[in-house]
Amino acid sequence: MRRVVRQSKFRHVFGQAVKNDQCYDDIRVSRVTWDSSFCAVNPRFVAIIIEASGGGAFLVLPLHKTGRIDKSYPTVCGHTGPVLDIDWCPHNDQVIASGSEDCTVMVWQIPENGLTLSLTEPVVILEGHSKRVGIVAWHPTARNVLLSAGCDNAIIIWNVGTGEALINLDDMHSDMIYNVSWSRNGSLICTASKDKKVRVIDPRKQEIVAEKEKAHEGARPMRAIFLADGNVFTTGFSRMSERQLALWNPKNMQEPIALHEMDTSNGVLLPFYDPDTSIIYLCGKGDSSIRYFEITDESPYVHYLNTFSSKEPQRGMGYMPKRGLDVNKCEIARFFKLHERKCEPIIMTVPRKSDLFQDDLYPDTAGPEAALEAEEWFEGKNADPILISLKHGYIPGKNRDLKVVKKNILDSKPAANKKSELSCAPKKPTDTASVQNEAKLDEILKEIKSIKETICSQDERISKLEQQLAKMAA
């Protein structure tokens, strides 16, 4: 006999907003008209793009810093135009990237215990876009590899460790790029664009692997993200302005595997995906709800689970990585919902009677250790994320400081030749060891210089004291 109700351990997932005293209050959330999430979260900090006079800024708050946030609280404020997107580095919880209307990408190192003074000096400024930068996304498995996309319709992939733009995809999109998503091992990216196309791209070969014209026929913005199995999940609008979600196989994008119509609201649907549970959470900008679906390999493939509803509309949304969740409370997702003047955490829980660790809810998940160095990835290597167990809770290790070793500008070829140089098949592999040795040498030279300066100043001080002693003796 066929079951009427599909069996799923996530059928009873429920959402709950935290109490008022656990919210972050009196925050002037950015009003800039851009469809990014405006919020980024990791197990240490929550970062929120805010309104700022005379440039762009964002707040970085330690997770425990709840309650009213003072107007004089320090910010990250080095951009000269509004900040449009922020993204925490998955391999270092103190490093965050930001893209701005000032056409630059900046990478910041946050002190271990948070900011005590406003931060105006980034670790590195990445300049290469000719128009505003609306998207920044770190590589999921390679250290110091950062992608940025701008309103110049270009995607640039940077080696943050050297400050170099190593891949420039500037001729693949004929219109504005709405979003970019890395595949699970970071070998491919998928993009959604204003020309209504969804593209799957191999960035190192600079090739479009698959594309679908009119993935959604409506004119409003789309989103496309990679799932763990290599399929692509999209959100968009129908010709009649109904919000849609669809599932695609990049090997055959003629027809979607599944297509669902939801409602006629006009907020862009931001998808947040958990590869461990195969749940997708959809947060509409301007909505007051979060809908969640389970993706399986049985028809109809995208299964509606439930909706979390609240009264206030959301201006943006942050999504906590799995290693930042409380496994003892069967928490499977935590969102940070932006209101006009505050940030409110929302906790998604699977009700369980037992207090024991629930292995089926928490398979090994992506940890903070990078599987590859940047040079290895640019040479063509791929690696899946290094997994960790959450059985005894995640204990953050010590993060190493981000060091940028700029190469001699005279050694690099002119920018015009960069693309053709990259597109040639035979490529001399970068010597990783020599780059690391250069970095160490640089560090040692800096230390020697500072020791010399200290000795000089001490010498001066000693001679002054000797003179004073001589005067006193006389």
Swiss-Prot record:
Principal location class:
membrane
For this protein, the record's SMART domains field holds: DUF1899, DUF1900, WD40
Gene disruption phenotype: No visible phenotype. Fibroblasts from mutant mice display a disordered actin cytoskeleton with a reduced width of the actin stress fibers. Likewise, these cells have several microtubule-organizing centers (MTOCs) and a disordered microbutule network.
One Pfam match: DUF1899
Entry keyword annotation includes Membrane: yes
Q: Which UniProt keywords apply?
A: Acetylation, Actin-binding, Cell membrane, Cell projection, Coiled coil, Cytoplasm, Cytoskeleton, Endosome, Membrane, Repeat, WD repeat
Q: Which domain of life is it from?
A: Eukaryota
Query: What GO CC terms are in its UniProt record?
Result: actin cytoskeleton; cell cortex; cytoskeleton; endosome membrane; flotillin complex; lamellipodium; lateral plasma membrane; ruffle membrane
Q: Which GO terms describe its biological process?
A: actin cortical patch assembly; actin cytoskeleton organization; activation of GTPase activity; corpus callosum development; endosomal transport; endosome fission; endosome membrane tubulation; establishment of protein localization
Specify whether Hydrolase is a keyword of the entry: no
Q: PANTHER family, from UniProt?
A: CORONIN, CORONIN-1C
Task: Write the protein's name.
Answer: Coronin-1C
Native species of this protein?
A: Mus musculus (Mouse)
Q: What gene is this protein translated from? A: Coro1c
